[in-house]
């Protein structure tokens, strides 16, 4: 049996992402949701059929752009990586995400 990595979930982070303008069209209309990374970047943990990426791999998308992403629109899907980086940058600048340094050896299994 192949084990699945536990995905990182954080409701506060998802709420923060949902309050941002849409990454694709910049709209702020109350329909923005946190879109999880999709199939084109699955090596990054983008899930797959019945799987969802970790909450850290999200970006804000309005209803229309989110619908386009889930219908395979390359104009949205091809820019997921930079949208996620932009979202992470905003979260770090606003103190939503903070990093505490620990040596690499600390994380070894």
Segments predicted by a language model, with ranges:
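Intrinsic-disorder/low-complexity regions
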Residues: 4, 9, 28, 66, ...
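Generic signal for short, ordered secondary-structure residues
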Residues: 1-4, 40-44
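Polybasic, low-complexity binding patches
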Residues: 44-59, 67-109
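Short cysteine-rich loop/turn motifs with clustered Cys
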Residues: 8-39, 64
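Arg/Lys-rich, low-complexity, intrinsically disordered N-terminal tails that contact nucleic acids
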Residues: 1-13, 109
């Amino acid at each position: 049996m192949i084990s699945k990595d536990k995905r990182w979930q954080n409701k506060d982070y998802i709420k923060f992402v949902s309050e941002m303008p849409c990454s694709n069209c910049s709209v702020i209309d109350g329909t923005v949701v946190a879109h999880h990374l999709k199939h084109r970047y699955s090596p990054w943990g983008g899930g797959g059929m019945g799987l969802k990426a970790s909450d850290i791999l999200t970006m804000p998308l309005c209803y229309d752009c989110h619908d386009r992403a889930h219908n395979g629109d390359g104009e949205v899907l091809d820019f997921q990586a930079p949208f996620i980086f932009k979202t992470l940058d905003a979260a770090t600048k606003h103190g939503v995400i903070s990093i505490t340094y620990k040596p690499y050896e600390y994380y070894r299994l």
